[in-house]
Design a protein with these regions (language model features):
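Short helix-initiation/N-cap motifs at beta->coil->alpha
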Residues: 53-65, 108-109, 143-157
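Extracytoplasmic small-molecule ligand-binding "clamshell" domains
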Residues: 1-78, 85
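Ligand-binding cleft/hinge of the Venus flytrap
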Residues: 25-29, 41-51, 91, 115, ...
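Short loop->beta-strand "edge-of-pocket" segments that line small-molecule binding or catalytic clefts
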Residues: 12-19, 34, 112-129, 140-142
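Solvent-exposed loop/turn segments at secondary-structure junctions
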Residues: 21-22, 60-61, 80-84, 106-108, ...
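Flexible hinge/capping segments at coil-to-helix
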Residues: 93, 102-120
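Ligand-binding "clamshell"
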Residues: 82-96
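Residues embedded in well-ordered beta-strands
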Residues: 14, 99-101
Length: 158
């Protein structure tokens, strides 16, 4: 099987574009997609000699949910063991370190203290961060939100 047949079986490269992480994909004021993901997909389509169709999703969980539906051929997502059941991942192109934000008066001083009863952590549902926390934490509660902005809103309200 050739790279074109494998990556673009319909004759065009259908790229799942995740707007949930502005580091990779975002829209400008006129609604045009910009970012590293866009640049990479455009270059890949060019090298394959096929057209590019960008299939846009608001959140990474939506991209992952469509992985087995034949809607997209390639996407940039966090590598996560739950997703690996239905998605074939290449080696990571980058690594993003994440941390916790706590209120100024919090008694939590290290990441080791976070996994405790009574601790609530807001994270976007089905995002790589939330999937990791779900598998790693045993005692803290995860508040799954619609998106990153909702997580910040919950943090600010509590």
């Amino acid at each position: 099987m050739t790279a074109i047949n494998e990556l673009a079986p319909t004759g065009k490269l259908r790229a799942g574009m995740n707007l949930g992480n502005n580091l990779f994909t975002r829209k400008n004021e006129s609604g045009e997609l910009l970012g590293v993901s866009v640049d990479l997909m455009q270059e890949l389509a060019k090298r394959l000699g096929v057209s590019l169709e960008m299939v846009v999703y608001e959140q990474p969980g939506q991209v992952a949910d469509d992985a087995t539906k034949g809607v997209w051929d390639i996407a940039i997502l966090a590598i996560e063991k739950t997703r690996a059941k239905t998605i074939s991942f290449s080696p990571a192109m980058t690594e993003i370190e994440a941390g916790y934000v706590v209120h100024q008066n919090s008694t939590l001083k290290s990441t080791k203290e976070v996994d405790a009863k009574g601790v609530k952590i807001a994270a976007p549902a089905k995002a790589g961060y939330e999937l990791y926390l779900t598998s790693a934490l045993k005692n803290a509660s995860i508040v799954r939100t619609k998106n990153f902005a909702s997580s910040i809103q919950i943090f600010n309200e509590n």
